[in-house]
């Protein structure tokens, strides 16, 4: 039977998947044929010959004309719907039809209509989201003038114009820009998660055209380049123009998903559009997501089919035996039909007749009821005011209505870093200068007090201060004003030692272009404290120091590298002193200090430990005054190393080390890589709920690790954090095995051969068993090492090692690698996964996970459009999972348990009745009762239970994350629970048949007339059944609302109203062939034994459920039962107000600004390519 699930999973695919797969197949076929892309600028006619796709994106499933056939085709993929369609055809065969055709048609039409309307509403929302992106405007060059067109209409070969802060419309070749040398600054946070500005440069032949529309319009260059691919950092091709050929690489290409920054305008030639862009190539395949409960229901429906077939077979055999033993006595007045020649023939026909009679074993309203429940729970998410983000006026949004209960079963969360855990904001928080810390708030008595707005330093005395900058320690301002020499050197170092460039976008307004966000924060801080970096040239740096312009001659920039983890500048002061200023990682600078700084360095290191314990990013600042003669000797060595062709970088590093020694320590800085509000608390809470969190980011390793410590994914109390940094397969394998051996020495070094064989067959029902480590560990792996670890032979090693860790950080990842990691856990762990991110680079993992969550940000909506749920802040995730997810799962499980039970109890009465009617496929109930049972009589109470049930207050759900655990292990509804429902239904059907049978057998009314007729018996059974079902739903409800009362007791009352109507003289006399229970209700319900039967049957049916609910928590309790008992005890006291406890960060890890810096930017500065005119003239304008 374990293979049936896999079989049913294969069956449950839908047409949207099929259509999208066919479209992707056509795209793949076209790309295989396209070995080289060829296009001409400004020549749509030529480019149209290649049938390149347009620039639109599509996430919707249906169109206006194909909605009805596609939606019906999709709905009939569900086994139950297909079953009832087949059943309808069977009912049209008179030889076997035992029920009227409308008993199936009416419910089937209602079910299909409700689901169709819901699907249509969902798809309209997707259409609107697509239009929001596709209908954005962009400027395009047409016949020598700039025109506005929609994004969807952009074609390959068009020349488009982008301005500052505009998103890039399509992958395009940069032609020219407003910046010198055709440079353009871009932000790629949506692609790789990095907030650093990056520089792209146009080739010289096109950058000379600048914004000359005549030249750009006449440009007819031909580009030959790679066909569409998903490699973000790879692009090669040639540009043929005016008889010359120019080489192209990825430095010339602007990718869709980037945002233009600090560049007034730029022009680009569109190379890839729509689905061909590298962003969309990395977005992964769209799949129709179904929950684990959906797959389980398909398996259970197959079980029901098998059980139904078995019963029909037994009943048909019983019919054959009965016909041979007793049936011939009845043939005198009820002869066989002409098409029945023997008892075997009759048995064969009876098989199908019972197949129709017992059809309610497969509940026709199951799927539509599930959809209604999911829709209702989705609205709870949309309406949740506690997930509403007021600054952006954005509520949480359930973008799909099919995954709500899956939110209550998540075991792995895969999170992006930039923009998801962090706010993309770096803030100068604290510093240490000459052994004294600044940045804490103190009262008049010198006692530490929390920061408050009233303690904010007033920088109004400095007209060049950045109004957005905040600082809360006035003593630092006083130290600056008192002209303390070391404080002066500290801020002078920060204002000179950087690669920031300044720009005056509006006259008198200074704007910084920071290649590293850390540097931007530092330079902004020095600006507010009176040391204003104003401008630079290749030879000078101009600083306004406390209102005075000072020009420093730039002698050398000792550039950053990953190995050096520091940078230095050498300048000549106006007083003709040669000074070296250096800043970098504390562990590096510490080794370069002069021995006289020993005591100061120890104090500063203590301060750095304090800063790091708060999760701040730290670095050290130092200087050295150089002897002029020594410097002249050194600069010659530097020049020789610079001109070397072989091992230039190595030789430059040695020259740098020669002069970066005997440094004098100035102090240290602490920058807050600002986490979103509540991130550490959320992660701690989710960890208590046994949810593992992996960070998948494109950012650098040190930055990612630092954030992992800040948000409590990694903790100091861990037994170790393993770094997998291998650059070849063997090294990566060895590092993974070494880590696993340390975590669990008895763990097999060699993977189980059987598991390895099954691992290569993902379609097999295979699950990797959990291995528990002997301690708490973390794992860090880079994208380069991940490329080897994700190979077929190593991926299982990676999975085993990573899943033994409490936290995992994967850095320097491509979007495709993110999806591969998520898929790896999905395939082998068989758990529910959730991916959360905010950028276009997160789309692939959002699509790959069972549940995709998009963080809505100001820059882009790509991740949100591809997500299943969206909101604005990461800390809303705990509410989404622990409140909405848990409740949705609990409600769905209660619904399914009751739904299957009530259908079994209802249907199996026919089984017992067969033994008393000669196995003739006659029904116990009135035909209208069969039609209305699932649609009217029992639908509203169970919907009320499924939409309003709440076992505990939402505050308790957040206070006790352990309540989430049953959903992770699928304890509340599984195959075992289904069997219990079946047994419960069998028992109840037995009671519901034989107790009324005993009541009416040989019974008389008060007037002496017999009441043991079929119609009276039928009415008694169905009335008893409705009474029992009402009490069952009441017993299962723990949270009563007015709606629950109305639905539960109102449905009972509605049954009696309809019963009286159907038995009324008006209907029965006018339509006797349809309504044939004339006066039965009036006569039967007036008898006391009928009501005594109802009470007795209800008590007998309720006893097992009451006993089980009482004994199970006592004899077989789970952790959630113990927590619930604790909560029920605490309910005697007021419900606690949930307070987010401030998490302290005891981590002693420190990371420097250099980790988010890009090597080689110093050389770009000294080349002068990034610089504009007259630095001194510009500086004077700020005085």
UniProtKB/Swiss-Prot annotation:
Pfam families per record: Cation_ATPase (PF13246), PhoLip_ATPase_C (PF16212), PhoLip_ATPase_N (PF16209)
Transmembrane segments: 96-116, 299-319, 348-368, 904-924, 927-947, 981-1001, 1014-1034, 1049-1069, 1090-1110
EC number: 7.6.2.1
GO molecular function, one term: ATP hydrolysis activity
Protein residues bound to ATP: 416-418, 519, 560, 583, 617, 697-699, 812, 818, 841-842
Residues noted as binding Mg(2+) in the record, renumbered to the chain: 416, 418, 838, 842
Cellular compartments annotated: Cytoplasmic vesicle, Secretory vesicle, Acrosome membrane
Keywords recorded for this protein, A-Z: ATP-binding, Cytoplasmic vesicle, Lipid transport, Magnesium, Membrane, Metal-binding, Nucleotide-binding, Translocase, Transmembrane, Transmembrane helix, Transport
Tissue specificity of this protein: Highly expressed in testis.
Enzyme class: translocase
Gene Ontology terms: cellular component: acrosomal membrane; acrosomal vesicle; membrane
Main location: membrane
InterPro entries in the cross-refs: ATPase_P-typ_cyto_dom_N, ATPase_P-typ_P_site, ATPase_P-typ_TM_dom_sf, ATPase_P-typ_transduc_dom_A_sf, HAD-like_sf, HAD_sf, P-type_ATPase_IV, P-type_ATPase_N
Cofactor(s) required, per the database record: Mg(2+)
Topology within the bilayer: Multi-pass membrane protein
Catalytic residues, chain numbering: 416
GO biological-process terms attached to the record: Golgi organization; phospholipid transport
Sequence similarity: Belongs to the cation transport ATPase (P-type) (TC 3.A.3) family. Type IV subfamily.
PANTHER family: PHOSPHOLIPID-TRANSPORTING ATPASE FETA, PROBABLE PHOSPHOLIPID-TRANSPORTING ATPASE
Function text: P4-ATPase flippase which catalyzes the hydrolysis of ATP coupled to the transport of aminophospholipids from the outer to the inner leaflet of various membranes and ensures the maintenance of asymmetric distribution of phospholipids. Phospholipid translocation also seems to be implicated in vesicle formation and in uptake of lipid signaling molecules. May play a role in phospholid transport across membranes and in acrosome formation.
Name this polypeptide is given: Phospholipid-transporting ATPase FetA
Organism: Mus musculus (Mouse)
Gene this protein is translated from: Atp8b5
């Amino acid at each position: 039977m374990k293979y049936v699930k896999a079989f049913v999973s294969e069956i449950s695919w839908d047409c949207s998947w099929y259509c999208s797969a066919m479209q992707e197949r056509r795209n793949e076929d076209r790309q295989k044929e396209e070995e080289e892309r060829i296009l001409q600028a400004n020549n749509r006619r030529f480019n149209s010959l290649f049938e390149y796709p347009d620039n639109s994106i599509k996430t919707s499933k249906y169109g206006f004309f194909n909605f009805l056939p596609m939606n019906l085709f999709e709905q009939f993929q569900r086994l139950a719907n297909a079953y009832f369609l087949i059943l309808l055809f069977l009912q049209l065969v008179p030889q076997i039809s035992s029920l009227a055709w409308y008993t199936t048609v009416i419910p089937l039409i209602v079910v299909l209509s409700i689901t169709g309307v819901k699907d249509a509403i969902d798809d309209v929302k997707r259409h609107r989201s697509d239009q929001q992106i596709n209908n954005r405007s962009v400027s395009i060059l047409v016949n020598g003038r700039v025109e506005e067109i929609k994004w969807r209409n952009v074609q390959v070969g068009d020349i488009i114009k982008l301005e500052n802060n505009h998103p890039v419309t399509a992958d395009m070749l940069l032609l020219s820009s407003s910046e010198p040398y055709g440079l353009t600054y871009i932000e790629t946070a949506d692609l790789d998660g990095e907030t650093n500005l990056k520089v792209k440069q146009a080739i010289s032949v096109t950058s000379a055209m600048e914004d000359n529309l005549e030249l750009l319009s006449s440009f007819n260059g031909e580009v030959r380049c790679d066909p569409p691919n998903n490699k973000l950092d790879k692009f090669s091709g040639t540009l043929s123009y005016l008889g010359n050929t120019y080489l192209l690489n990825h430095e010339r290409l602007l990718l869709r998903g980037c945002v233009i920054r600090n560049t007034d305008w730029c022009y680009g030639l569109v190379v890839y559009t729509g689905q061909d862009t590298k962003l969309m190539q990395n977005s992964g395949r769209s799949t129709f997501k179904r929950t684990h409960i959906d797959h389980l229901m398909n398996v259970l429906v197959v079980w029901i089919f098998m059980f139904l077939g078995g019963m029909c077979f037994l009943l048909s055999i019983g019919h054959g035996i009965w016909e041979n033993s007793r049936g011939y006595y009845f043939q005198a007045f009820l002869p066989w039909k002409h098409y029945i020649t023997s008892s075997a023939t009759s048995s064969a026909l009876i098989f199908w007749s019972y197949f129709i009679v017992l059809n309610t074993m497969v509940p026709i309203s199951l799927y539509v009821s599930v959809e209604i429940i999911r829709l209702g729970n989705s609205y709870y998410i949309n309406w949740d005011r506690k997930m509403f983000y007021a600054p952006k006026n954005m509520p949480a949004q359930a973008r799909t209505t099919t995954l709500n209960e899956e939110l209550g079963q998540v075991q792995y969360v895969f999170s992006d870093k930039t923009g998801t855990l962090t706010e993309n904001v770096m803030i100068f928080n604290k510093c240490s200068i000459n052994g004294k810390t600044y940045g804490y708030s103190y009262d008049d008595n010198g006692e530490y007090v929390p920061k408050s707005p009233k303690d904010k330093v007033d920088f109004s005395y400095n007209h060049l201060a950045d109004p957005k900058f905040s600082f809360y320690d006035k003593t630092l301002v006083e130290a600056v004003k008192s002209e303390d020499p070391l404080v002066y050197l500290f801020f002078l170092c920060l204002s000179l030692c950087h690669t920031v460039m300044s720009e005056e976008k509006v006259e008198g307004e200074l704007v910084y272009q920071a290649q590293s966000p850390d540097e931007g924060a530092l330079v902004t801080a020095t600006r507010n404290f009176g040391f204003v970096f104003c401008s630079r040239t290749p030879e000078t740096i101009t600083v306004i120091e406390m209102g005075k312009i000072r020009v420093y001659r730039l002698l050398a920039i000792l550039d950053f590298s990953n190995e050096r983890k520091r940078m230095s500048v050498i300048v000549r002061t106006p007083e003709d002193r040669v000074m070296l200023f250096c800043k970098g990682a504390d562990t590096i600078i510490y080794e370069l200090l002069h021995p006289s700084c020993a005591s100061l360095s120890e104090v500063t290191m203590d301060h750095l430990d304090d800063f790091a314990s708060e999760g701040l990013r730290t670095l050290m600042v130092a200087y050295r005054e150089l002897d002029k003669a020594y410097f002249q000797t050194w600069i010659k060595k530097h020049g020789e190393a610079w001109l070397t062709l072989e091992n230039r970088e190595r030789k430059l590093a040695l020259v740098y080390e020669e002069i970066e020694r005997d440094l004098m320590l100035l102090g240290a800085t602490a920058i807050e890589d600002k986490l979103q509000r509540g991130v550490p608390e959320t992660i701690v809470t989710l960890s208590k709920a046994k949810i593992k969190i992996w960070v998948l980011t494109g950012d650098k390793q040190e930055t990612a690790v630092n954030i992992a410590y800040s948000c409590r994914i990694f903790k100091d109390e861990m037994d170790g954090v393993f770094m997998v940094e291998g650059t070849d397969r063997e090294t990566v394998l060895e590092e993974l095995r070494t880590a696993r051996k340390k975590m669990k020495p008895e763990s097999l070094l060699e993977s189980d051969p059987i598991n390895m064989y099954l691992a290569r067959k993902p379609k097999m029902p295979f699950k990797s068993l959990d291995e528990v480590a002997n301690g708490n560990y973390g794992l860090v792996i880079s994208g380069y090492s991940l490329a080897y670890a994700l190979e077929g032979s190593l991926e299982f090693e990676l999975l085993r090692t990573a899943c033994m860790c409490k936290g995992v950080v994967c850095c320097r990842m491509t979007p495709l690698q993110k999806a591969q990691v998520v898929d790896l856990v999905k395939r082998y762990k068989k758990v529910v996964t959730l991916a959360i991110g905010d950028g276009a680079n997160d789309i692939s993992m959002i699509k790959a996970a069972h549940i995709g969550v998009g963080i809505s940000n100001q820059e882009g909506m790509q991740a949100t459009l591809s997500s299943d749920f969206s909101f604005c802040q990461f800390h809303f995730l705990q509410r989404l999972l622990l409140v909405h997810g848990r409740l949705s799962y609990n409600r769905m499980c209660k619904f399914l348990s009751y739904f299957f039970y009530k259908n079994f109890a209802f249907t199996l009465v026919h089984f017992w009745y067969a033994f008393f009617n000669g196995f003739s496929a006659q029904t116990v109930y009135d035909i209208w009762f069969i039609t209305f049972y699932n649609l009217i009589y029992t639908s509203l109470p169970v919907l009320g239970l499924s939409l309003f049930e709440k076992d505990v207050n939402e505050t308790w759900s957040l206070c006790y994350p352990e309540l989430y655990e049953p959903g992770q292990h699928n304890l509340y509804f599984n195959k075992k629970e289904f069997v219990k429902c079946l047994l419960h239904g069998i028992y109840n059907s037995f009671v519901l048949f034989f107790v009324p049978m005993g009541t009416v057998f040989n019974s008389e009314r008060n007037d002496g007339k017999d009441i043991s007729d079929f119609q009276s018996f039928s009415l008694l059974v169905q009335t008893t059944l409705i009474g029992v079902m009402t009490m069952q739903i009441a017993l299962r409800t723990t949270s009563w609302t007015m709606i629950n009362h109305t639905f539960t007791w109102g449905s009972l009352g509605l049954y009696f109203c309809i019963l009286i109507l159907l038995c009324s003289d008006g209907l029965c006399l006018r339509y006797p062939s349809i309504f044939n229970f004339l006066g039965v209700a009036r006569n039967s319900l007036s008898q006391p034994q009928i009501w005594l039967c109802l009470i007795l049957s209800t008590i007998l049916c309720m006893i097992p459920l009451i006993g089980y609910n009482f004994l199970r928590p006592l004899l077989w309790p789970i952790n959630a039962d113990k927590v619930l008992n604790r909560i029920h005890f605490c309910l005697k006291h007021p419900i606690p107000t949930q307070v987010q406890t401030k998490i302290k960060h005891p981590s002693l890890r420190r990371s420097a600004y250099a980790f988010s810096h890009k090597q080689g930017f110093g050389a770009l500065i000294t080349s002068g390519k990034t610089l504009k005119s007259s630095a001194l003239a510009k500086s004077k304008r700020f005085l």
